[in-house]
């Protein structure tokens, strides 16, 4: 099944890719879309392939007239895997919140332009960052 009859997956992928470097096409499966942001490098002195990053990831799933999302904050480790972790440094937390809110705003605006809404998933009750008013 494509995302919606009015919005085929290929067109959505192009629109999502236009939002910036966040879309991870290789991790998008079926009707699920995966985005992430490596916002803060843990240690810039390490070789690039060994660096870890604080950041966030968000997954979208289509419904009839909207997309639902879940997101996490955490560590992107040197193995290339995300691990949900509590962010202890307030400056890092602020940077993650700022980049996540900015992406969420642009994503919601893009979806509105194609007459879709963006809503938290029903089972996503523990949101670490308030994304909208």
Curated annotation (Swiss-Prot):
It is found in: Cytoplasm. Its main location: cytoplasm. It comes from the Bacteria. Pfam families: Crl. GO terms for biological process: positive regulation of DNA-templated transcription. The keyword Transcription regulation applies. InterPro entries: Tscrpt_reg_Crl, Tscrpt_reg_Crl_sf. Disulfide bonds: none annotated. Coiled coil: none annotated. Residues 99-122 are annotated as: Essential for activity. Gene3D superfamilies: Sigma factor-binding protein Crl monomer. Binds to the sigma-S subunit of RNA polymerase, activating expression of sigma-S-regulated genes. Stimulates RNA polymerase holoenzyme formation and may bind to several other sigma factors, such as sigma-70 and sigma-32. This is Sigma factor-binding protein Crl. It comes from Yersinia enterocolitica serotype O:8 / biotype 1B (strain NCTC 13174 / 8081). The lineage of its organism: Bacteria, Pseudomonadati, Pseudomonadota, Gammaproteobacteria, Enterobacterales.
């Amino acid at each position: 099944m494509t995302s919606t009859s009015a919005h085929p997956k290929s067109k959505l992928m192009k629109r999502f890719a236009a939002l910036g470097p966040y879309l991870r096409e290789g991790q998008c499966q079926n009707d699920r879309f995966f985005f992430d942001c490596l916002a803060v490098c843990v240690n810039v002195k390490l070789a690039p392939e060994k660096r870890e990053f604080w950041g966030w990831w968000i997954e979208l799933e289509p419904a009839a007239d909207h997309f639902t999302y879940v997101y996490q904050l955490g560590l992107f480790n040197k193995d290339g895997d995300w691990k949900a972790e509590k962010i202890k440094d307030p400056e890092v937390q602020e940077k993650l919140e700022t980049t996540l809110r900015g992406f969420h705003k642009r994503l919601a605006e893009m979806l509105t332009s194609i007459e879709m809404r963006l809503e938290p998933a029903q089972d996503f009750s523990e949101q670490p960052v308030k994304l909208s008013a």
